[in-house]
Amino acid sequence: MADSEHRAADDGGAGAAGAPRTAGVVGLGLIGGSFARAYRAAGWRVLAFDTDADTFDAACVETVAGGLDESTIPLCDIIVLAANPAACVEWLRTHAEALGACSDPAAGTGPLVIDTAGVKARVCDEAFDIARTHGFAFCGTHPMAGTEHSGFAHSTATLFQGQPMVLVPPPLDDIERLMLLDRTKELLEPCGFGKFSVTDAATHDRVIGFTSQLCHVVSNAYVKSPTAQEHHGFSAGSYKDLTRVAHLNPRMWSELMVANADNLVFELDTIIGNLGAYRDALAAGDTGELEGLLAEGDRIKRALDDAADGQGNR
């Protein structure tokens, strides 16, 4: 048993009769590990599961109090599925009966289950049906936070502080939907998220194809230039900004991108077309055309920043 299991929880994690609230975490990588650390820092008890025994043992040193399985699922206030989309769905299928047996979504009892996968349709299309059939609460989520690193060793309790969180609730009537969203936000308070956005799975995946997946593809492709081998001493902020996410987890990102292929292909076609216009202007030596293209991009970026400033989102 980890030492953390014996430590008294602070008041911030106290539940009924002063007992610590409990968070379950499936997958102790960067995201799952950061959820585990955030809840532990807030005084919650953390139960977890990871397929890698060494990772689980490392997490038990100071963060995780014990294992998450069918016997401990009923102890949880929230369960965070921080795994790839297929693994999230499989975990739900495997544990659906245990979740349903201890839950009454209308009364707000039993664990709230969320997933953190980077694509939502792949998970939510099945998860909503599983949760409805077995009678437990589920809400899709996507924390808009991360680093170029991966693994529990790089997780931190402050990763989500002030960062946006996207919520994707199931199709419910207005009252049930509001109750689920309020419950989700309340249970996520220890993580310190900033703005919450609510959307549907299709919209999430369409936008994330542009704001995240396209960025990773462009960054990853950019460093394949042979000139990259000579960048030392010639690069500064622009190079660093553009290449930060070239370093990624290929297996995880390939699954996310293939699951969102239609949206990502559209964005790739769009940027390839735009790049072609710059190339054609350069090849033709057309300074006026190139200046116009650059001015257009500058104007669009300024308008986007102004709009973000107006909403307090920059």
Residues covered by each model-derived region:
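NAD(P)+-binding Rossmann beta1-loop-alpha1 motif at the extreme N-terminus of oxidoreductases
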Residues: 2-74, 78
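Phosphate-coordination loops involved in phosphoryl transfer and adenosine-cofactor binding
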Residues: 19-22, 110, 162
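Interdomain hinge/lid region at the active-site interface
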Residues: 230-301
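Internal alpha-helical scaffold of NAD(P)-dependent oxidoreductase catalytic cores
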Residues: 157-244
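Glycine-rich, N-terminal phosphate-binding loop of Rossmann-like dinucleotide-binding domains
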Residues: 82-84, 117, 169
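Rossmann-like NAD(P)(H) cofactor-binding subdomain of soluble oxidoreductases
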Residues: 94-153
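Rossmann-like NAD(P)-binding element
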Residues: 70-108, 112
